[in-house]
Amino acid sequence: MRFLRFLKIFFTVIRFGLDEMMLSRVNDRRVRLLLRITTIGRKFDQPPGVRLRLALESLGPIFVKFGQVLSTRRDLLRPDIATELAKLQDQVPPFDSAVAIAIIEKSLGAPVDTIFDDFERVPVASASIAQVHFATLKIGQHAGKQVAVKVLRPNMLPVIDSDLALLRDIAVWAERLWADGKRLKPREVVAEFDKYLHDELDLMREAANGSQLRRNFAGLDLLLVPEMYWEYCTANVLVMERMVGVPISQVDTLRVAGVDIPKLAREGVEIFFTQVFRDGFFHADMHPGNIQVSLDPAHFGRYIALDFGIIGALSDFDKNYLAQNFLAFFKRDYHRVATLHLESGWVPATTRVEELESAIRAVCEPYFDRALKDISLGQVLMRLFSTSRRFNVEIQPQLVLLQKTMLNVEGLGRSLDPELDLWKTAKPYLERWMNEQIGAKGWYERLKIEAPQWSKTLPQLPRLIHHVLAQRHDAQQRGINDETIRQILLEQKRTNRLLQGLLMFGVAVGVGAVLARAWLAIAYGGY
């Protein structure tokens, strides 16, 4: 079976001329000679990106998904190919509703007719991973509620694991034979895709993501997120509140209904940056199919978010990297941008900041030939990643996911309002987050969180200092290889951060003690 699947992939590659695209970059002369022979008489009118998209579509939904993930890696692909892959549509015929009902009944342990009224056998939506049916809950505390029932496709795991095994084999060969193999890191891309697919196969995980997003926006008049009905959620079935809205792509319908379109565009950007900088938890699949707008008088003009299979998470370190990079970029302070990359610890310690600064200036300066409102933050981030790749920077998957989502949000906002000023909308969020981190309130909050750990580690400070100095001395004496030195330097940088924190804590404790004693002296007339 696996061999037959491999043959299909092989003949698809030949049919669409992908062998010409890939093997022309192979180092082996014999392979290049074979390529010349096999391409005699073949001519392709369509550009490479179109041929790659058509080939992935012909190979089925798993490869379509792979192409969609690949399209987000604009730090690796040529822009024309990435743009073409972004057109891939995850639309497949629905599976038999009788099979869907059998899965629901097995997962929930009861006949569908006892759980739901008016279960619609024709699915309202169908994709490669699951399909959705509308129904009304019949029992329990939510009886009478209209719901959407998402059902995982049957027997998906064996198919996915088989195709992933083939993709892993192809990635290994590509890395060995292809001149661009090491730069494009095919095994890394396939591993990322593996995680992405298996995350989507767990509907309990998706329900948890949706529940978290709903909780984050509770009390904010910005975004509606469906309630998850946990008693009816399993790994194969997800039952959530049915949301009624107009797809965001139907702009004319929204305008006729009286929705303020420019305001809608601004609020979309506000929702995104609230998720990124306030919560560090963002919906990472914000294409038009997953976004609607409510026309219900109680929630008129509010966004509705659907499908929570892909979620991104950012640490405070990630948020600081983003905020400082964007602020430095718009000040055209390229030295600061380069320094931030080095300080992140993701850049080899041997990198010269001046070289990185020069490369960043070369890709960023042309952006300022246009109005600030026309600058794409997603494109800026993408160009920074592409430049960083040349310096062997460790690309962070969470930031790549953010960059892809940012491009979607920008495209959505500008399709609603071509005059949308993304920087003007985003800047207050960046500055507010920076002020909260640097200001007294932010310092106090971090102190409350870190103080217990620091109090345990502070007595170890002399030993840590001795350990750092000994590491550097040993490295110089033993003449160890560059990679080991790089790892030691990275570890040293992390240790230095800890030492700085400990010293700050020690100073804070000392100053606090002095002030407390001074206050007692003033209050009680002496020590």
UniProtKB/Swiss-Prot annotation:
<comment type="similarity">
    <text>Belongs to the ABC1 family. UbiB subfamily.</text>
</comment>
<dbReference type="InterPro" id="IPR045308">
    <property type="entry name" value="UbiB_bact"/>
</dbReference>
<dbReference type="InterPro" id="IPR010232">
    <property type="entry name" value="UbiB"/>
</dbReference>
<keyword id="KW-1003">Cell membrane</keyword>
<keyword id="KW-0831">Ubiquinone biosynthesis</keyword>
<comment type="pathway">
    <text>Cofactor biosynthesis; ubiquinone biosynthesis [regulation].</text>
</comment>
<feature type="binding site">
    <location>
        <begin position="124"/>
        <end position="132"/>
    </location>
    <ligand>
        <name>ATP</name>
    </ligand>
</feature>
<feature type="domain" description="Protein kinase">
    <location>
        <begin position="118"/>
        <end position="501"/>
    </location>
</feature>
<dbReference type="GO" id="GO:0005886">
    <property type="term" value="C:plasma membrane"/>
</dbReference>
<feature type="transmembrane region" description="Helical">
    <location>
        <begin position="502"/>
        <end position="522"/>
    </location>
</feature>
<keyword id="KW-1133">Transmembrane helix</keyword>
<dbReference type="InterPro" id="IPR011009">
    <property type="entry name" value="Kinase-like_dom_sf"/>
</dbReference>
<dbReference type="InterPro" id="IPR004147">
    <property type="entry name" value="ABC1_dom"/>
</dbReference>
<comment type="function">
    <text>Is probably a protein kinase regulator of UbiI activity which is involved in aerobic coenzyme Q (ubiquinone) biosynthesis.</text>
</comment>
<dbReference type="GO" id="GO:0004672">
    <property type="term" value="F:protein kinase activity"/>
</dbReference>
<keyword id="KW-0067">ATP-binding</keyword>
<keyword id="KW-0812">Transmembrane</keyword>
<feature type="active site" description="Proton acceptor">
    <location>
        <position position="285"/>
    </location>
</feature>
<keyword id="KW-0997">Cell inner membrane</keyword>
<keyword id="KW-0547">Nucleotide-binding</keyword>
<keyword id="KW-0472">Membrane</keyword>
<dbReference type="InterPro" id="IPR050154">
    <property type="entry name" value="UbiB_kinase"/>
</dbReference>
<dbReference type="GO" id="GO:0006744">
    <property type="term" value="P:ubiquinone biosynthetic process"/>
</dbReference>
<protein>
    <recommendedName>
        <fullName>Probable protein kinase UbiB</fullName>
        <ecNumber>2.7.-.-</ecNumber>
    </recommendedName>
</protein>
<keyword id="KW-0418">Kinase</keyword>
<dbReference type="GO" id="GO:0005524">
    <property type="term" value="F:ATP binding"/>
</dbReference>
<dbReference type="Pfam" id="PF03109">
    <property type="entry name" value="ABC1"/>
</dbReference>
<keyword id="KW-0808">Transferase</keyword>
<dbReference type="GO" id="GO:0010795">
    <property type="term" value="P:regulation of ubiquinone biosynthetic process"/>
</dbReference>
<feature type="binding site">
    <location>
        <position position="150"/>
    </location>
    <ligand>
        <name>ATP</name>
    </ligand>
</feature>
